[in-house]
Amino acid sequence: MGIEYSASSITVLEGLEAVRKRPGMYIGSTGPNGLHHLVYEVVDNCIDEAMAGYCDRITVVLEQGNVVRVEDNGRGIPVDVHPHEGVSALEVVLTKLHAGGKFDKKSYKVSGGLHGVGVSVVNALSLWVEVTVYRDGAEYYQKFNVGMPLAPVEKRGVSEKRGTIIRWQADPSIFKETVAYDFDVLLTRLRELAFLNSTVVIQLRDERLATAKQVEFAFEGGIRHFVSYLNRGKSVVPERPLYIEGSKSDVLVEVALQYHDGYTENVQSFVNDINTREGGTHLEGFKSALTRVANDFLKKSPKLAKKIEREEKLVGEDVRAGLTVVLSVKIPEPQFEGQTKTKLGNSEVRGIVDSLVGERLTLYFEQNPGVLTKILEKSIAEAQARLAARRAKEAARRKSGMDSFGLPGKLADCSLKDPAKCEVYIVEGDSAGGSAKKGRDSKTQAILPLWGKMLNVEKTRLDKVLHNEKLQPIIATLGTGVGKDFDLTRIRYHKVIIMADADVDGSHIRTLLLTFFFRYLPQIIEAGYVYLAMPPLYRIAWSKKELYVYSDTERDEALESIGKKSGVAVQRYKGLGEMDGTQLWETTMNPVRRKMMQVVLSDAVEADRVFSTLMGEDVEPRRKFIEENAIYARLDV
């Protein structure tokens, strides 16, 4: 806390020249994700101040005209003259790429992003940036246009405040798709940061509306509160999430975990507040410790051990069934790898997390035998189901001479084999499936009709999912496998299209299928492969003409446009089976004319809550959710 933070703390690595030419290299894209990344970069700097112990309040404001303001009460960016650059440190941080106080590890031991990179990239990709700094009893101001300072830092007077305010307007010539920020997208990330940093209050305010909208996050319980938030509305063990904290060799480890009454695991892992969606060595260490400790205690419990076959052990997926865990690691030099650079590669972290978690879990279970017994019983039940599923699969393979997940007989496959050019329609019922088969382009479009009883996977363990008469054909058709066997590179179609009727039953089937994809195949949603077909609600025919419309509003507008002509006929489609192959092709399957909705997972935490509410056991939260959201539904009752 006593180390001086001044201009000499700022290390400069290179200039800004390339940023405007190749912005995607610095912020990932110039679409909506890249636009929001500007905010994250600035907020990350505030979080770095908080992690260093100097900031406890961060405010993000969306102003009129797509202007963003981010304010913190940290030490303020240094404004004294930089020893090597000859201008103020503030100007260096805003105009030099890789200039910041993070590189010498003195001003900041740990940082969630590269301080200086973020601010300078925001400056390079904005029409203008204004910075106000409060430090050393004074207020300082500097403005930049397209990355260049308009004047040196100006001292504006005396102030007792402390901190930094950064305002900017993103450049629409860079962000051609949109420069409008999405409140909910920012809310998701800021809520996550507040959970991960329990000492900080984070406020998000939207002043673009007639009445300003504001949320404030403050979670003194930190990641323990995060786990409770993820598990709300569920029956849980233990009642209060188990919390583990410790450090070794400058690696700080925090874990909070709790089991719920479902069967899917919910693992959220972070390194320096960065969401490591692809996992990494920290997560490997946690999983290894949890499985080892569970098996160690099982050996000491002969009564429980008898419940699984001799020579069999609990495996990771048994022990993690129904587990919600948040793992947060903070390290000085993270090495990221993987497709999206969200996988931790530091080999030393695995052992540190493994030993710390193993030691603390052992101590906790020794002191809480009741909790241990409940967790072991759940894990054993999962192991029994897994072994039963394996035996059934092996028996089916011996009987048929092939893998029991061969392509289903009712699949009408397409002739092309390039997944990027192929799509599969998942259709409820043989009648709609028949129309779809007649109307499709057999070169690129496959049709999978579903039959039998649809399973609610929210209340079901994996062995039943794998052998359900409706879900097994989907798993076989997609080709990715499921669970530990999942491999996205084996997917056979890059468009998986759910096509169901527009009535209550169709909506229920869509929800059940989306629950299945979210719980067991979330990677294909994240890859952008899942879509909802939008069949028309009405066919309007008049004077040898016809028009298909997709909502009551479109119907009313069309009828008003047609006027009071005689012979206008309006047909309401109750189900897909009412359309013949040609009509289904023209309205719902023709890539040139069809309407589809891509299923996007922008907020996994909120998605988890919605699926748990809609498909879980507890009736009251479901009733409340339906009452609050009924206005948004489009159902034919």
From Swiss-Prot:
Q: Give the catalytic activity.
A: ATP-dependent breakage, passage and rejoining of double-stranded DNA
Give start and end of each Toprim domain.
422-536
Detail which positions bind Mg(2+) 2: D501, D503
Q: How does it assemble?
A: Heterotetramer, composed of two GyrA and two GyrB chains. In the heterotetramer, GyrA contains the active site tyrosine that forms a transient covalent intermediate with DNA, while GyrB binds cofactors and catalyzes ATP hydrolysis.
Q: Name the domain of life this protein comes from.
A: Bacteria
One GO CC term on file: cytoplasm
**What other facts are recorded?**
Few gyrases are as efficient as E.coli at forming negative supercoils. Not all organisms have 2 type II topoisomerases; in organisms with a single type II topoisomerase this enzyme also has to decatenate newly replicated chromosomes.
Spell out the protein name for this chain: DNA gyrase subunit B
- The EC number of this protein is 5.6.2.2
